[in-house]
Amino acid sequence: MNKFASGAGAFVAVCAGKSNVSARAGARMTGTDFTANDLGILTAHLVLAAEAAGLASCILGWRNEKKLCAALGIPEKTAIPVVVALGYPADGYEIRPKKRKSLEETFLVLGEPIP
């Protein structure tokens, strides 16, 4: 697990098991598996609910699924695409500045010229 998150009060493992028959049929008919969308929506709501409750959160992308499954008693065929660390931030903790592309480099409005 990420060392900076080792002091978190709790971790939530967001799991993805085998989808049901109707979900698989829908994925075949549309050519789209909505599992990632659903997990993203779930994770976003989890983070927003935590913030509303006064908790800080960090979505962790780096994880060892095999070790997590063993530690949590989760069948190995179950995917754990996301882990969220939750806890109260340390007094005076400042979020480090992120290095990200500008909105103009990542956002496109249909009908507008590409920059």
Language-model segments: residues:
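Short, electropositive alpha-helical surface patch
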Residues: K67-P81
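Structured binding elements
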Residues: G54
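C-terminal helix-cap and adjacent tail motif
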Residues: V82-P115
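Glycine/small-residue-rich phosphate/adenosyl-binding loop
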Residues: M1-L39
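Solvent-exposed alpha-helices and their adjacent loops that cap or buttress functional pockets
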Residues: K3-S6, I74-E76, K99-R100
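Aromatic/hydrophobic pocket-lining residues that form π-stacking "cages" and hydrophobic walls in ligand
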Residues: H45-L46
